[in-house]
């Protein structure tokens, strides 16, 4: 893991957690505990995900259970509970940073409320949206003192269109 080599004193490498995968909440908790035990800075980027079709095709090829949550509501629940988990750990003093990459207003509002109510250092929490989408969210977060990023999705048009259909 690159984070083992590079996250010794600051968050350099962020691990992306595709929250549409059933395994992601447990994987995130395990990785956070492992980083903390090793004295590393934990850095995570939470996304809902964009590779569902590929994941399902791979599961069928391997003859394993569908790795995707059964509904969008289950994916939302996994995303929001994992965001709360990381924010809670940060509020408890765990050396962690999280980027919440989402366009979902409810998820953002919940996270901002928790950061505010728990007195979490805003430098440990950042947000990201796709370039050209939901600019009003990005600007409002930035005006509120949060690190807020735009990211460009550079890939074949087929993949980009599939991603946009999920938003």
Label every PLM stretch briefly.
Residues 1-167:
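Positively charged, amphipathic and often flexible ligand-engagement surfaces
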